[in-house]
């Protein structure tokens, strides 16, 4: 394991961006993506550190850590659902299939917690009792575990700090069929359960 001194000494070498001649980058918060003509995509995880979509600095080795973590989770969940990863030729790089993303963000929540406007606790504390189209009783406490995990959807708001909560009816109105939503719901819960099982082995608690 690297010492704090070794990490500090690597700050000047932190990986901010890359340029591949002949290809146009799609720059995200942390990853730079390049679409290839053959239907594949190059994803490069940088060391950019962001908070609510604002870059605040660079953290040495962050890119390779999150890229390798993603690769590990893809392997651990391949029996639940296919994924886009083809190869990891470098600690910071994933070669993947291009795919059309869902027009929504999906989050499985096991606890009533959070500090953002779209979090369960923020809305509950403000007096809301129907959140994401689901009814919640009075008397819940912050960070309390829910009787069972719930699947929630939110509108993707690119360039904005927070997402907007959606009900199932909102999801269907955005062109997602009831059949597809049922599959999304099922796969999301199974992924969350697998995540919980593996997190416990590392003395971690998967909250959402």
Question: Predicted segment positions?
Answer:
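Short, compositionally biased leader-like segments
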Residues: 1-7, 173-174, 179
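Active-site loop/lid in soluble adenylation, ligation, and acyl-transfer enzymes
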Residues: 2-157
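Short acidic loop-to-beta-strand element that houses the catalytic metal-binding Asp/Glu
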Residues: 31-32, 205-208
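A short mid-domain helix/strand-loop element embedded in enzyme catalytic domains
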Residues: 146-177
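A long amphipathic alpha-helix within ATP-dependent nucleotide-binding catalytic cores
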Residues: 174-205
């Amino acid at each position: 394991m690297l010492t704090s001194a070794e990490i500090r000494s690597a700050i000047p070498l932190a990986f901010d961006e890359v340029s591949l001649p002949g290809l146009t980058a799609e720059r995200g918060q942390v990853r730079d993506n390049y679409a290839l003509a053959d239907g594949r995509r190059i994803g490069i995880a940088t060391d950019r550190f962001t908070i609510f979509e604002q870059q605040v600095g660079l953290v040495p080795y962050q890119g390779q850590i999150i890229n390798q973590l993603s690769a590990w989770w893809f392997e651990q969940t391949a029996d639940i659902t296919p994924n886009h990863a083809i190869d990891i030729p470098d600690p910071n790089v994933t070669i993947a299939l291009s795919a059309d993303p869902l027009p929504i963000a999906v989050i499985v929540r096991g606890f009533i917690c959070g500090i953002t406007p779209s979090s369960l606790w923020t809305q509950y504390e403000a007096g809301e009792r129907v959140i994401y189209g689901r009814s919640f009783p009075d008397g819940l406490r912050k960070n309390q575990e829910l009787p069972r995990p719930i699947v929630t959807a939110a509108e993707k708001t690119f360039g904005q700090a927070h997402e907007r909560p959606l009900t199932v009816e909102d999801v269907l109105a955005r062109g997602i069929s009831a059949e597809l939503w049922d599959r999304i719901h099922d796969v999301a819960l199974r992924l969350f359960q697998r995540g919980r099982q593996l997190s416990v082995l590392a003395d971690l608690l998967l909250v959402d």
